[in-house]
Amino acid sequence: MISPTGNESYEEFLNAFRFSFSSVNSYNNCPRCFWLSYLQDPKLEQSENAFAQWGSFMHSIYERFYGGKLDFFDICAEYEDQYHQKVTIQFPPNAWVDLNKKYYEAGLDAIELIDDLPSHISVLDIECKFRLKIRDISFVGYADLILQNTETEDIIIVDHKSKSKFKSKAEQKEYARQLYLY
């Protein structure tokens, strides 16, 4: 287990630990899961799964499109051509729906909605890594897309979610915490 060493207190140890939205959320949902995922030594092996592969693939499409490396007219063809090379693991069985079909179609539906940004919105950064301290506690985060309204100078932070729709306003509020941190 990773824990304080020598004369280091738990407070000093936690102040030295770099938190992320995922680690804070993990602790909030299940402290034991947090310990197993972030503090256990040696670390647990993380196995790949279809959900993670699909999410990474979707993020790569958004990143390349908004970064100017993937043309609007090629985006659907890129998704269809690359899908089975990027999502190589089958989704788990589900009694009510074929998750393989559902996620394929959901991804296609999502990218069909991608549109060029309005002329007054500019891209400041894509997959922006940032570090900050809040009351001496270190945080790290990755913003998918940082935009600016050139008319108002407002900053817009976009976080692409690869999950299905929010089940409730409470769940949506829980996910909004990530944007507040950013």
Model-derived regions: residue spans:
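Nuclease catalytic cores
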Residues: 21-70, 104, 127
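An acidic intrinsically disordered interaction segment
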Residues: 2, 16-29, 137-148
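Generic recognition of stable, solvent-exposed alpha-helical segments in well-folded globular domains
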Residues: 19, 53-57, 102, 174-177, ...
